[in-house]
From Swiss-Prot:
[4Fe-4S] cluster binds at C51, C55, C58. Its cofactor is [4Fe-4S] cluster; [2Fe-2S] cluster. This is Biotin synthase. It catalyses: (4R,5S)-dethiobiotin + (sulfur carrier)-SH + 2 reduced [2Fe-2S]-[ferredoxin] + 2 S-adenosyl-L-methionine = (sulfur carrier)-H + biotin + 2 5'-deoxyadenosine + 2 L-methionine + 2 oxidized [2Fe-2S]-[ferredoxin]. Residues 36-254 form the Radical SAM core domain. The keyword Transferase applies. Pathway: Cofactor biosynthesis; biotin biosynthesis; biotin from 7,8-diaminononanoate: step 2/2. [2Fe-2S] cluster binds at C95, C126, C186, R258. Binds 1 [4Fe-4S] cluster. The cluster is coordinated with 3 cysteines and an exchangeable S-adenosyl-L-methionine. Binds 1 [2Fe-2S] cluster. The cluster is coordinated with 3 cysteines and 1 arginine. Its EC number is 2.8.1.6. It comes from the Bacteria. It comes from Buchnera aphidicola subsp. Acyrthosiphon pisum (strain APS) (Acyrthosiphon pisum symbiotic bacterium). The gene is bioB.
Length: 343
């Protein structure tokens, strides 16, 4: 029977002496994972900007002047080319994000074909497209989508300070639709939005007490973008962030805890402490949607220093003729692409 975390239990974890907390987190990590391996994902923005939502941290919102270049939905050849590059670089999962409040029905055939083609390349797939209804979730699942990302971002009580165009309950409904469809859930939050410690406690409680815990939990450090309302937020204290990773590992022992956005601002020592605290997944590549990320070369050097081995490193490379066959076999017609690409 799954443990249900109480407020008092979660508070006690946050109050633990730092090294005691780290020891407990590392123990939990070793019970469920090889401590010397790390899961690598690559994230691509397949449709950038012009989002109608008002998330105060996001440069893709049409409400803020951030200088972001808007881009329509990428053509399937561009997406598959990026997926091949990610696979050849060692990524086992290809994640795709579109700046929508939610996908429209005209988008679904295009999205389904993208999923099928990337699955043929031998990669896990993940998408983040906004809110989903149960019918859309089922279509994506039937196409072969492995994971769907929909973050809770912060606590229910603090949420309306960050976003007003989508309710917290809508986010929970989407997670329910994803879980009911048979897909795996990817859901986490952002640290540094101006939240209090209590909000961090409540966020981790909400995630850990879902009917089934998320298989993947991205923990993001706010990337402060000029032009957004959160551009001047205070920096997150590194040890506070490491503590959150450790508590997340203890509360969700079988989940992959992903060290996500903001990693490019962390030095090697902070990242190493996060891995020690139980983080065992990263995004690999120079961009996370529109935010910077450490260069691949630097990540490989860090892995070497820490003796970390990427998961599924033994996966076979995609041969050029196999890749060309996948491209040619795409059933997407130009009118389907143009219908989906309308902003």
């Amino acid at each position: 029977m799954k443990k249900k975390w109480t407020l008092e239990e979660t508070k006690m974890l946050f109050k633990k002496p730092f090294f005691n907390l780290m020891f407990q987190a590392q123990e939990e990590h070793r019970k469920n994972f090889d401590p010397n391996t790390i899961q690598i994902s690559t994230l691509l923005s397949i449709k950038t900007g012009s989002c109608p939502e008002d998330c105060k941290y996001c440069p893709q919102s049409s409400r803020y002047k951030t200088g972001l270049k808007k881009e329509p939905l990428l053509e399937i050849e561009q997406i598959l080319s990026a997926a091949k590059k990610a696979k050849d670089s060692g990524s086992s999962r290809f994640c795709m994000g579109a700046a929508w409040k939610n996908p429209k029905e005209k988008d679904m055939p295009y999205l389904e074909e993208i999923i099928k083609k990337i699955k043929e390349m031998g990669m896990e797939t993940c998408m983040t497209l906004g809110t989903l209804n149960s019918t859309q979730a089922k279509k994506l699942a039937d196409a072969g989508l492995d994971f769907y990302n929909h973050n809770l971002d912060t606590s229910k009580n603090f949420y309306n300070n960050i976003i007003t165009t989508r309710t917290y309950q809508e986010r929970l409904h989407t997670l329910h639709a994803v879980r009911s469809s048979g897909m795996k859930v990817c859901s986490g939050g952002i640290i540094g939005l101006g939240e209090k410690k209590q909000d961090r406690i409540e966020l981790l409680m909400e995630l850990s007490n879902l009917s089934i815990q998320p298989e993947s939990v991205p923990i993001n450090m706010l990337v402060k973008i000029p032009g957004t309302p959160m551009a001047d937020n205070k920096d997150v204290e590194p040890f506070d962030f490491i503590r959150i990773i450790a508590v997340a590992r203890i509360m969700m022992p079988k989940s992959y805890i992903r060290l996500s956005a903001g990693r490019h601002k962390m030095n090697d020592q902070t990242q190493a402490m996060c891995f020690m605290a139980g983080a065992n997944s990263i995004f690999y590549g120079c961009k996370l949607l529109t935010s910077d990320n450490p260069e691949e070369k630097h990540d490989l050097e860090l892995f070497k220093k820490l003796d970390l081995i990427p998961e599924n490193k033994t996966q076979t490379l995609l041969k050029e003729d196999e890749y060309k066959t996948i491209i040619k076999s795409s059933k997407i017609k130009k009118d389907q692409y143009y219908n989906a690409a309308i902003i």
